[in-house]
Amino acid sequence: MGFTLHSVYFTLKVSLLLGSLLGLSLGLEFMGIPNQWTRFLRWDASTRSELSFQFKTNVSAGLLLYFDDGGVCDFLCLSLVDGRIQLQFSVDCAETTVITDKQVNDSNWHFLMVSRNHLRTVLVLDGEAKPGEVRPQRQYMNIVSDLFVGGVPSYIRPAALTLDGVLSEPPFQGFILNLKYGNSEPQLLGSQGVRLEMEGLCTENPCENGGTCFLLDGEPRCDCSATGYTGKLCSEDVNHIPGLSHLMMSEQGRSKARDENMATFRGSEYLCYDLSQNPIQSSSDEITLSFKTWQRNGLILHTGKSADYVNLALKDGAVSLVINLGSGAFEAIVEPVNGKFNDNAWHDVKVTRNLRQHSGIGHAMVNKLHCLVTISVDGILTTTGYTQEDYTMLGSDDFFYVGGSPSTADLPGSPVSNNFMGCLKEVVYKNNDIRLELSRLARIGDTKMKIYGEVKFVCENVATLDPISFETPEAYISLPKWNTKRMGSISFDFRTTEPNGLILFTHGKPQERKDARSQKNTKVDFFAVELLDGNLYLLLDMGSGTIKVKATQKKANDGEWYHVDIQRDGRSGTISVNSRRTPFTASGESEILDLEGDMYLGGLPENRAGLILPTELWTAMLNYGYVGCIRDLFIDGRSKNIRQLAEAQNAAGVKSSCSRLSTKQCDSYPCKNNAVCKDGWNRFICDCTGTGYWGRTCEREASILSYDGSMYMKIIMPMVMHTEAEDVSFRFMSQRAYGLLMATTSRDSADTLRLELDGGRVKLMVNLDCIRINCNASKGPETLYAGQKLNDNEWHTVRVVRRGKSLKLMVDDDVAEGTMVGDHTRLEFHNIETGIMTEKRYISVIPSSFIGHLQSLMFNGMLYIDLCKNGDIDYCELKARFGLRNIIADPVTFKTKSSYLSLATLQAYTSMHLFFQFKTTSADGFILFNSGDGNDFIAVELVKGYIHYVFDLGNGPNVIKGNSDRPLNDNQWHNVVITRDNSNTHSLKVDTKMVTQVINGAKNLDLKGDLYIAGLAQGMYSNLPKLVASRDGFQGCLASVDLNGRLPDLINDALHRSGQIERGCEGPSTTCQEDSCANQGICNQQWEGFTCDCSMTSYSGSQCNDPGATYIFGKSGGLILYTWPANDRPSTRTDRLAVGFSTTVKDGILVRIDSAPGLGDFLQLHIEQGKIGVVFNIGTVDISIKEESTPVNDGKYHVVRFTRNGGNATLQVDSWPVNEHYPTGNTDSERFQMVKQKIPFKYNRPVEEWLQEKGRQLTIFNTQAQIAIGGKDRGRLFQGQLSGLYYNGLKVLNMAAENNPNIKINGSVRLVGEVPSILGTTPTTSVPPEMSTTVMETTTTMATTTTRKNRSPPSIQTTDDIVSSAECSSDDEDFIDCEPSTGKSGGELVIPLLVEDPLDIPPIATRAPFITLPPTFRPLLTIIETTKDSLSMTSEAGLPCLSDQGSDGCDDDGLVISGYGSGETFDSNLPPTDDEDFYTTFSLVTDKSLSTSIFEGGYKAHAPKWESKDFRPNKVSETGRTTTTSLSPELIRSTASSSTGMVPKLPAGKMNNRELKPQPDIVLLPLPTAYELDSTKLKSPLITSPMFRNVPTANPTEPGIRRVPGASEVVRESSSTTGMVVGIVAAAALCILILLYAMYKYRNRDEGSYQVDETRNYISNSAQSNGTLMKEKQQSSKSGHKKQKNKDKEYYV
């Protein structure tokens, strides 16, 4: 088609070669067969040249043409790839590729041109240009080979070809016509497999008068440009016009080729012909011309003014015609089918207008005269239309403009604002009267023709206005000052897919103007164009206020080209986008736009010190640079070569081409750290918000600032800022519910944009201070809330987006939106502040300080925290600390438990948010208390190492207990958050564990009086409300105290202070270190220091580095014999034995422990054949464990440690590997098989399940009677040294040295040195001296078992419980029911002393691997003796009560909730009931505590004295134990404790006013309920870990299962008579019958079942509190398919 030819209309020179040479004007057909090719003479494209041809094809792949430098570096290859044209070229080994967007395998003709210009090569397909550029060192291309078209000959060596694989390219299939090197035809050197097409069409030249024949789309055409003739065959004569001599042609000239009348225009040149002397009046006329250009827009020709004109222009690559004869414009657009007319090829344009009679429909239209207008381009494309009928004459007495005008934008009807750039030829206007050859008149210099600019009358290549791409938002270029005053125009094209960007901006000189604030304000004239949210806006201020004009109705960021044309005349003007015009009128009266300085295109410079940015220009405020393409920039009709400007300025991020990548950039997932990827213009955009990272791919970790309530970061802006749009984002983490996050502040106004935590929510407040500037005042600050419970110490992301009056607040996924009231939208600020608001002059209520962490603060594109840290800005005032630090704000130490202070009343009427941090080694203590009106109160206390939150809102007291994994008195900082919202939902969060409870009824907390911190005044403890357990103050550190948004200074704000209170928190003066305790002693941290537990070391002293009591046994043998009193014989399930020794004997007994006569249980430590070993028997067979590896009779000092737990045992010498023993077999199952046939069938299954759940051998070492040391009584004499003997809390050698009456020494035994002093003057007791600070707890358990599947083992003990009595001295403990003794000696209650090992013991696999192993406890057992005298004494004296009720009955006031750390809550208002299920729901414990201490006096173990003051809290357990407790009245009385140092007593309390039912005087084993498994498998308990380093203890017996060792268990018995013992032994023979009787009896007894929570093993009590009796019950799982419940009860009294 004609519009796709290059240089074929006017400058075509055809030379047909005869003989062997054939011009390509005849065309070539390529068949696509292998080894096809055509070869043309070398194309000299080294620097500047053009190559063009036409082609058509229907295949998608093939080689079009190729040449290279002979295999070195340079080449050029044109090929078909996937139906598109691909250009590859290389210069000096710098290679690039260009691919067209358009597919060409459509069997249509296409025009292709390759233009070379040094390092730049442009591929033009049907008018669409695709440039490619390389940047090598060499500036030209080396060319050696000829040009190959359609394929490369196979005989060429591959090494001689530069491009690898070019020989394997598929051959081209299709047609190629008119191959040209510039304007000349190349010489064909040879071909193979190519057919000549259309021969003979131009052989006989059909053109007359010297016209030149050429082929166009396969058909012959004539070029008449050089003949003086016109027409299809150059046969039409040019009209001779008499009277106009300057237009007449002589007859002689008709047959000669006339000189070409052409000229080159470069955008600022134009021709002007004056018509004032010969005005035009015509009804029919014709305009003809030819043009050639790369430019898309430009004025070609114009004549006329106002409403009578003709305008011909190029608009977006199409030919535009506008004619107005006075009654309205006729507009026509001619576009090619493919491509554009700006393809740098010649195109012919012809416009005709003829008067015609037009018959229309209706009488009004009949026989009317109209002007028929026809426009054609290249003789093919034609558009026809009619002008309005009222006027038919064109009258013009103005000028004829060719190629441009002084002000193209101001010409009437002009669709473009810029002049033409390119070549124009033979511009002719003619009508019935005249013929104006305007091009020739200009060339010959006619007087009426004025030439403006340097017009050259030849056709030269006009440099294309190449598009440029802004690849980053920071990229920009500077343009010269825009000299516009009263009028001006700007036009450009843009193309992008990004929604926001500043395209143009320039402003004038600053002018001081006064605004409504009566203060000077700098204002400037400015002009700007911006893209915001996909819409194009024009902003203009000419001194009287800014106008903002939206120029698009739909979003323009769709990746297509948009043409923008802005024309201004005075105050008014238009902006058109793709011909859609929008008028505008500037504010005020001024018609002058006073600009100064550069105009910025694409963005703004980083240094904006000299710029005054208007607040209305949101993209500038938000730092949105433009990313996309710009082309064809014309200012006042003159082009701006922005490519050259970018290269001259070396503009970073600006590329001199525009191509859109076909692939989406986010498909490769470039964004890291879970950032959101968005596709931009040829780039990906990683949104790092909320990730904690920054950078192009969010690869750099953002800096974190830590704030402690006194810290802040303040950004002081270099100048006062005014904005109407803000983007704010950051992350924060805090445990406080209140605190300032970020705020903008002003020194001159109350303007602020403030974000703060308010009640656990983020509050956004925007105040624009309308009052001071006399604007339309709003109703006050705009406020939005988002998020909830954000004080959870987790990262949360906050984003704020404001656009004028529109507000949006986003917190994580919660979104709140609002619209501001009033007309004022400008925010003024001098500072951006975080943490603390320092600018307070205009703030009525100062927000609370922030305690927490802040990260990634971005305000309008500026990442201020990182900019401040890196020193990129120098206006940063920083008081916060970098890094994710542990924040301890304003710590205060309460050095004693009697220290406290009081503050003003806590204001928490409707809601409450409390936060504090604490650190202590004390297990108990008051932290916070405030009483109120009526019964209202709030208390926070530490009970047994767990936080209790107790409160009463008028409905009765309630308690919520923290469910921490471990006690909190571990000398570590812990965080506590307590909240109460408007719905009366209370929550307690300790570190990461939260408990929540909804309270019905009253919702308001009416507090009065002082708020007490860390304790109470003397006398207040006796009047505390229900459920408050503490009776002493808090000893330790408090920090970061937040009282419902108020951060008090605990010392300065205190109304009253008492005791030792100091700032800071140094903690214990000495702390446990690795070497604090020698010889593997265990270090126990205390607040005032630490203590060492040397029990299992054989050493003594404060740091376990002093030798223990040492005896030397001579050659003749000796014996040290310790005998338990008859009423004080313990039975144990676990034992621990340690002793140091040195010897050279090969055989001897070191220590032997025997049970009462007739029982046969024993434990013996001996040396056999020089090796140490232990043998023990606990009722079945002898069990032996030995150190086989190394003899110990080497005369060196060794320490041996032995532990037993049931049948499991460990033995370790020094630090050698541990020897372990795990027995096999199950005696219970064997005995069950013996008696199975005697059990009724229906009971077989329950009994079998019961035995399987028990799953243990005999595990109890019964009725221990004596300890023999030295082996003389057995004839196996020990000779050598024994030191520091320890057995289950007894240090026998120390006792022997102190002449304990229960010890006898015989034979050759000699004490070495003096007995080590224990705690100075305190004599040695059965309580080890290192345990003087241990916490004692009384635990009495009752357990009833319902036989059912999936239940924990009913009879497996894992803790130090009361196990047996002297009345049950049989080995068949599991089958014998024993009655309690009624003898004079009475019963005795055993008190286990628990000390936790601070070391973590590695877990050992069990049958229940998903259970967390409980922590280490070190029980030390003593007794509370009860005799008839003591019972009567307590009966007469009454039971002690510590509540304000005195000693009258110890009613409800003595009740507290148990289950410390369980997270459960209890409502005191539940009605009393006799239903046992009620007590399975709650775990209760009385608040009457047993005071315990070390013994005073000698070793009278059965009559200890107790002093609570001598005990200090130890590091308590990580996991507690919940047991179910029930005591008979007799037992309660027998265990009552008085505070007078007489016989220890246990309290008697009521369970919520429910009286206890009479029970037998018995104590039952607890039921472990820590896990449940299939009942068909043996159940195993959770075993506690040992108290000492590297010394494992043994687990209860279970075949093949190795467990974490357990703590020792000791029980002591009352005395028994010999007859009773004989009777019990005889009763053993009847065990089977008794078992059947017991099973039958208790199976048919309907009793409630109770589960024991094994996760709460013995929570240690405070040293100052009265040892609490635990009576906790938990919900049992009831069998749904059995009506009767099988009970198994073991009585060990």
Curated annotation (Swiss-Prot):
Where located? Membrane
Family, per entry: Belongs to the neurexin family.
Species of origin reads Gallus gallus (Chicken)
Which GO terms fall under biological process for this protein? Answer: cell adhesion
Question: What cellular component GO annotations does this protein have?
Answer: membrane
| Chain spans, region Disordered | 1535-1554, 1661-1693
Q: What is this protein called?
A: Neurexin-3
Tissues in which the protein is found: Brain and arteries (at protein level).
Give UniProt keywords alphabetically.
Calcium, Cell adhesion, Disulfide bond, EGF-like domain, Glycoprotein, Membrane, Metal-binding, Repeat, Signal, Transmembrane, Transmembrane helix
